[in-house]
From Swiss-Prot:
One of its GO terms (molecular function) is trans-L-3-hydroxyproline dehydratase activity. Substrate binds at Q85, G94, S95, D251, G256, T257. This is 4-hydroxyproline 2-epimerase 1. Catalyzes the epimerization of trans-4-hydroxy-L-proline (t4LHyp) to cis-4-hydroxy-D-proline (c4DHyp). May be involved in a degradation pathway of t4LHyp. Can also catalyze the epimerization of trans-3-hydroxy-L-proline (t3LHyp) to cis-3-hydroxy-D-proline (c3DHyp) in vitro. Displays no proline racemase activity. Its EC number is 5.1.1.8. Belongs to the proline racemase family. It comes from Rhizobium rhizogenes (strain K84 / ATCC BAA-868). It is an enzyme of class 5 (isomerase).
Amino acid sequence: MRWKRTIQLLDVHCEGEIGRVAIGGVPKIPGNTVAEQLHWLNTDPKGEELRRFLVLEPRGAPIGSVNLLLPARHPDADAAFIILQPDQAHASSGSNSICVTTALLESGIVEMKEPETVVTLETAAGLVRATATCRDGRCEKVRLTMVPSFVHELDVGIDTPQWGRIKLDLCYGGIFYALVDVGQIGLTIGKANAASLVQAGMVLKELINRTVPVVHPEIPAISGVAYVMFRDIDADGAIRTCTTMWPGRADRSPCGTGNSANLATLHARGKARVGDVFKSRSIIGSEFEVGLQAETEVAGKPAIIPTITGRGFTFGLSQVALDPFDPMANGFALTDVWGPLAGDI
């Protein structure tokens, strides 16, 4: 076989959300920092080509992300990574941080120490401390100390043709989120409503980014609302979530960065204090523990340090390659399985 590019992938899922980890064959990504590398992936044609090669058909699939494992730039980090998705490369993700930690330890890239191994991950949003509980050569669960999370604006009003005026919270949890109480769109969070929730999320994301610009005050490479996360409260008090992802799918996990952003809103409203721990439940019923570890500031704004605890599971090892004569090197997506906005890919 005459392949011009090969990349090795370890398949991992975190509470149902797939995060494949590129552990070999990753080309050198230009940039002196992970934030600069993220910017290159999102602005340079060669960066877009790499992302599309890994994420889109025929090598990729609509579900999940691909994590590019990179050499750490920060002296305190064990590894760096950037998340690739159909829309762009992203700075941070809780479920993908758990997938990457699990991959590093169970593949032996980072030495596993029992009963606990601390792995420091470098992201474009900052350092994430991952504390893994390990037993019998297996990573059983991971507690993430997330980057500082803060409220950009609470109770933002958006006029919509479908649901009238919607109130939402704009918050940062490693990327920017619009957090919407799901009852405002006449739905509940459950498997049967996944397609309707996704469609609503795509509409709201477009409206929000058109009317309410957001930029991180210290990291300009992180801007715009990445996801709309719908939220509700279950009968047992758990926070039920559904994060909607372009071009049209639902996060299978409870969503780490989304719950970090949501915890910032609870803190701002006086509903969460340092030491509190909440349960978050996804659209498929999988769970994270969400904790408020500390208070801090970001560019003078009140902020918090959240923790997210969940599980990662390896389920495969694969290699993707490019035949030099393959006309579909740049990948493609169709609306039949990729979602209503896949025609824009």
